[in-house]
């Protein structure tokens, strides 16, 4: 009897969907190795492997069988995806073109040999970033450079602006996945893209105001206000937008700073200067990486750098990796909470994830624990442990969707009357 490897859903799924992986037709109690691999658009290879043993019937179901070794151990039905590691050190998995899938190759090999035994079965599975029917609309309105993703069904939908961090460009994969959940999501570029500025010495909030007004005025976006989703530098900019601009009902900040970092933030005649970088506080890890977690002066010391969140009427959710080594995300979230409450504002929700690092991504993205930091100009540690980080990503994804549906009046379950 030949071994077969089956996946459910078969053939294709969305990146944030769980996969059921089963092997049948093995010898009872047979030791096997499962391997998974994918290549990103730049040709970089990501791989994971895990050792398993078939049950008494010669079957192996990853939802019931623990991994005995390899890239991860224990009961981890999605471990072969989230535990992938890049062949090139410090390479972060990002999706550059959401209109094509990541193609995952899975193999079942006989035995537990490190170099791999005889190939018993293989399968290829496509992990997509746009659910069927999701619409992708490039935006060039005034100065705004963005891509808007709309759900398949007729609108209007709750609107969200999605902001990524240092590096610039236009990353669309989080917005495209969220559009499959009933939101109109606009991935917004703000530097190093198209005809936008190449650097970010000054962040002018007027640009972001134009984006907010565009999205609020879109016929497929329901009002009155919109949501913001920002990670890292995008979280910092989201806080500035919520502080200075009207029309932002809800904001999710993932590991953001409450201080301006590496650039000035300007709005009209107001300027927030960046906090001082304390170069003598940069440490080296035992792996020879820079650890910059203590390298920023506290905004409590340099109050002028503190983004004036107390002006905001936005409802906030802070998602915090407690092992973030990019900067002190938990400290920042707590200081924002204190500042808001001191000014009679609503206490924000803060969810802390132990042993989670800086880049809390949509589910199943492998942990990027170290990599090039463009402000530092060197490889730094971003923190995090693979297993707890993967748990954090799964929970954070659910939390932010629940939050936005609640705050922005998400899925309306009634049937709209025919006009």
From Swiss-Prot:
GO terms for molecular function: carboxylic ester hydrolase activity; fatty acyl-CoA hydrolase activity. The active site is at 232 (charge relay system), 324 (charge relay system), 358 (charge relay system). It holds the Pfam family BAAT_C. GO terms for biological process: acyl-CoA metabolic process; fatty acid metabolic process; long-chain fatty acid metabolic process; negative regulation of cardiac muscle cell apoptotic process; very long-chain fatty acid metabolic process. Keywords: Cytoplasm, Fatty acid metabolism, Hydrolase, Lipid metabolism, Phosphoprotein, Serine esterase. Expressed in liver. Its EC number is 3.1.2.-, 3.1.2.2. It is an enzyme of class 3 (hydrolase). It comes from the Eukaryota. InterPro entries: AB_hydrolase_fold (IPR029058), Acyl-CoA_thioEstase_long-chain (IPR016662), BAAT_C (IPR014940), Thio_Ohase/aa_AcTrfase (IPR006862), Thio_Ohase/BAAT_N (IPR042490). SUPFAM superfamilies: alpha/beta-Hydrolases (SSF53474). Pathway: Lipid metabolism; fatty acid metabolism. GO terms for cellular component: cytosol. The modification Phosphoserine is found at residue 416. Its main location: cytoplasm. PANTHER family: ACYL-COENZYME A THIOESTERASE 1-RELATED (PTHR10824:SF12), ACYL-COENZYME A THIOESTERASE-RELATED (PTHR10824). Monomer. Catalyzes the hydrolysis of acyl-CoAs into free fatty acids and coenzyme A (CoASH), regulating their respective intracellular levels. More active towards saturated and unsaturated long chain fatty acyl-CoAs (C12-C20). Belongs to the C/M/P thioester hydrolase family. This is Acyl-coenzyme A thioesterase 1. It comes from Rattus norvegicus.
């Amino acid at each position: 009897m030949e071994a077969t490897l089956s996946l459910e859903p078969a053939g294709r799924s969305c990146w944030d969907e769980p996969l059921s992986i089963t092997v049948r037709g093995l010898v009872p109690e047979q030791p096997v190795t499962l391997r998974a691999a994918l290549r990103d658009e730049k040709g970089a290879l990501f791989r994971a492997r895990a050792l398993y043993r078939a049950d008494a019937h010669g079957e192996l179901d990853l939802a019931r069988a623990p991994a005995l070794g390899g890239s991860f151990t224990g009961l981890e039905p999605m471990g072969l995806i989230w535990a992938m590691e890049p062949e090139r050190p410090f390479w972060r998995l990002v999706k550059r073109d959401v209109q094509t899938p990541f193609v995952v190759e899975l193999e079942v090999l006989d035995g537990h040999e490190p170099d791999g035994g005889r190939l018993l079965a293989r399968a290829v599975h496509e992990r997509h970033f746009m659910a069927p029917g999701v619409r992708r609309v490039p935006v060039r309105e005034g100065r705004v450079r963005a891509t808007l993703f709309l759900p398949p069904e007729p609108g209007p939908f709750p609107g969200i602006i999605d902001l990524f961090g240092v590096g610039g460009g236009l990353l669309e994969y989080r917005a495209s996945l969220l559009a499959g959940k009933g939101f109109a999501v606009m991935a917004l570029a703000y530097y190093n893209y198209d005809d936008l500025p190449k650097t970010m010495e000054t962040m002018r909030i007027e640009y972001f105001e134009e984006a907010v007004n565009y999205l609020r005025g879109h016929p497929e976006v329901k009002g009155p206000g919109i949501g913001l989703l920002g990670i890292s530098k995008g979280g910092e900019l989201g806080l500035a937008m919520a502080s200075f601009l009207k029309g932002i009902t809800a904001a999710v900040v993932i590991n953001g700073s409450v201080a301006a970092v590496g650039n000035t933030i300007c709005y009209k005649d107001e300027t927030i200067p960046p906090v001082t970088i304390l170069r003598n506080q940069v440490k080296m890890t035992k792996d020879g990486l820079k650890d910059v977690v203590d390298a920023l002066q506290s905004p409590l010391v340099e109050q002028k750098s503190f983004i004036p969140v107390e002006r905001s009427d936005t409802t906030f959710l802070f998602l915090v990796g407690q092992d973030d080594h990019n900067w002190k995300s938990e400290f920042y979230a707590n200081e924002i909470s204190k500042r808001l409450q001191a000014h009679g504002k609503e206490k924000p929700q803060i969810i802390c994830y132990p042993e989670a690092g800086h880049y809390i991504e949509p589910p199943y993205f492998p942990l990027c624990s170290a990599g090039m930091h463009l402000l530092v100009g060197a490889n730094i540690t971003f923190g995090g442990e693979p297993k707890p980080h993967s748990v954090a990503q799964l929970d954070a994804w659910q939390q932010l969707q629940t939050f936005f549906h609640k705050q922005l009046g998400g899925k309306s379950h009634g049937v709209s009357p025919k006009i």
